[in-house]
């Protein structure tokens, strides 16, 4: 429409130039915004992706905590119920971790693994928030029903829990590995330490926190 109007006024140089400039700016803004979203946000969960995490790490400062979070028995969920429900489970977890508080920023690290970055916080300062998150996910009964009827939001799922017994329920849990910058090393090294703590949590029975 803008282009059509512009072409209609092509004989008026000033107006035509202004309209072409406006169209160019709008297209540039839309393309840039779209590319940024594709580059830094996870398509499935709509939270930051690994690239966004690494960008955030550059401004994390000298004091921060990391939590690596992994969905327990996720392969079994996919194998038993299919990838559609597996994707829904990831959206539920992403919704929950994006509301964790304590100033955290949530990211999908890859697969069923997520990361929380707490700038300016020590490990001790984020433990309660992470324990509340673990409990919130463990208390969330994901109702297995028709795909269109499934709630994608953590809070809505908790509200609806127990409303109907005609459907089977899936209990989600996560294991969490925690480290803070006092452990020393680069950001990538701290991620590895948090990952090791995460797998200790899994080895210890899952659905728990472990610390580096």
Can you name each region flagged by the protein language model?
Residues 5-43, 51-65:
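Signal-transducing coiled-coil linker helices
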Residues 37-55, 69-83, 91:
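Conserved nucleotide-binding and Mg2+-coordinating catalytic segments in signaling enzymes
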Residues 45, 67-70, 111, 194:
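Conserved metal-coordinating catalytic motifs of nucleotidyl cyclase and c-di-GMP turnover enzymes
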Residues 74, 93, 109, 114, ...:
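Hydrophobic framework residues that shape the active-site pocket
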Residues 85-105, 113, 132, 139:
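Active-site-proximal alpha-helical element of nucleotidyl cyclase-like catalytic domains
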Residues 97, 113-122, 152:
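Short beta-strand->loop micro-motif that forms the acidic, two-metal-ion catalytic signature
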Residues 108, 138-174:
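Catalytic core regions of nucleotide second-messenger enzymes
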Residues 127, 161-169, 173, 179-211:
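Catalytic-core segments of nucleotide cyclases and related cyclic-nucleotide turnover enzymes
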């Amino acid at each position: 429409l803008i282009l059509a109007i512009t072409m209609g006024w092509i004989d008026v140089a000033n107006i035509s130039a202004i309209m072409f400039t406006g169209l160019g700016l709008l297209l540039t803004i839309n393309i840039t915004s779209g590319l940024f979203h594709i580059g830094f946000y996870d398509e499935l969960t709509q939270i930051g992706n690994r690239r966004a995490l690494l960008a955030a790490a550059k401004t994390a400062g000298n004091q921060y905590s990391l939590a690596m979070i992994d969905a327990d028995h996720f392969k079994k969920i996919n194998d038993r119920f299919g990838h559609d429900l597996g994707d829904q489970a990831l959206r539920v977890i992403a919704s929950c971790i994006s509301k964790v508080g304590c100033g955290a920023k949530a990211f999908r690290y890859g697969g069923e693994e997520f990361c929380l970055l707490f700038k300016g916080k020590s490990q001790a300062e984020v433990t309660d928030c992470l324990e509340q998150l673990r409990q919130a996910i463990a208390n969330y009964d994901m109702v297995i029903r028709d795909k269109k009827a499934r709630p994608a939001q953590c809070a809505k799922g908790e509200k609806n829990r127990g409303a109907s017994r005609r459907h089977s329920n899936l209990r989600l849990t996560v294991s969490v590995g925690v480290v803070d910058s006092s452990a020393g090393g680069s950001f990538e090294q701290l991620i590895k330490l948090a990952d090791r703590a995460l797998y200790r949590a899994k080895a210890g029975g899952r659905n728990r926190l472990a610390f580096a």
